[in-house]
């Protein structure tokens, strides 16, 4: 596995970082979730992700929205990416724990950076009839999140 660095570096005294490596979630869905929570307070983002997991609130899809239906609220196309939201919530909780360990106040922190990068592809094959095989690849995602006290 290659060494993965953060895209940006903030002030180490006022920021906390967390990263999730090679998570088995969709890159397209995780991109849309990260775009939505970027700029939110950490507590608001946690509530939003928990509502998405419970299918109470949809995530607006702005780029990858073919075949998506209209949802309630100020959005056109939206979906409920449950598995991506669960993994991003884990990374957010990790970033809050890192902030608490550093002596920062997690309740007052904003998400200044939430980004995904495509990870490696896990190649696999599915056996088919008559001795054939169909490729079945699993995409992975690297998520990085940076919280800051000042906005």
From Swiss-Prot:
Residue ranges, compositional bias (Polar residues): 1-18
Region (Disordered) residue spans: 1-23
Domain of life: Archaea
GO biological processes: cytoplasmic translation
Keywords, ordered alphabetically: Ribonucleoprotein, Ribosomal protein, RNA-binding, rRNA-binding
SUPFAM superfamilies reported for this sequence: Ribosomal protein L22 (SSF54843)
Any GO CC annotation of this UniProt entry: cytosolic large ribosomal subunit
InterPro entries (alphabetical): Ribosomal_uL22 (IPR001063), Ribosomal_uL22_euk/arc (IPR005721), Ribosomal_uL22_sf (IPR036394)
Record-linked Pfam families: Ribosomal_L22
GO MF assignments: rRNA binding; structural constituent of ribosome
Role: This protein binds specifically to 23S rRNA. It makes multiple contacts with different domains of the 23S rRNA in the assembled 50S subunit and ribosome.
HAMAP family noted in UniProt: Ribosomal_uL22_A (MF_01331_A)
Family: Belongs to the universal ribosomal protein uL22 family.
Oligomer and partners: Part of the 50S ribosomal subunit.
Record PANTHER family: 60S RIBOSOMAL PROTEIN L17 (PTHR11593:SF10)
UniProt-recorded name of the protein: Large ribosomal subunit protein uL22
Gene: rpl22
């Amino acid at each position: 596995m290659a060494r993965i660095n953060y895209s940006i570096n903030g002030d180490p005294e006022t920021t906390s970082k967390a990263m999730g490596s090679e998570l088995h979630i969709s890159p397209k869905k995780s991109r849309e979730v990260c775009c939505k929570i970027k700029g939110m307070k950490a507590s608001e983002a946690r509530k939003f992700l928990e509502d998405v997991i419970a299918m109470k609130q949809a995530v607006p899809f702005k780029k990858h929205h073919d075949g998506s239906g209209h949802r309630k609220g100020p959005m056109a196309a939206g979906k409920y990416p449950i598995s991506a939201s669960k993994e991003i919530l884990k990374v957010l909780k990790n970033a809050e724990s890192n902030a608490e360990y550093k002596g920062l106040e997690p309740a007052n922190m904003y998400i200044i950076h939430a980004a995904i990068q495509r990870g490696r592809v896990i190649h696999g094959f599915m056996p088919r009839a008559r001795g054939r095989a169909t490729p079945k690849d699993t995409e992975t995602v690297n998520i990085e999140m940076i919280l800051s006290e000042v906005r």
